[in-house]
Amino acid sequence: MENTHTHKLYLYNDKKHSFLYVIACVINVCKYEPLQAEQCTIIAHKNGKCCVKNGDYLEMLELKEKFEKLNLISEIESHESYMH
């Protein structure tokens, strides 16, 4: 069994930006289609956060920095997974 780490980037609801602004930012940063970005934005609004991407740490850090430049709150979480 092989142990691997994946990193998840969560976008948080901040209650100060409009839905349209956040959707546009998610489209820009994550390269999502509008419907997918809208779904992420709604999940973040309803649950307080939404996992918008997962992958290696450096990729998630780059996306996190892009969200920060747009004044959106995001966080990287590390998750262990096991492959058989």
Feature roles, as predicted:
Residues M1-H84:
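Terminal domain-initiation and capping elements
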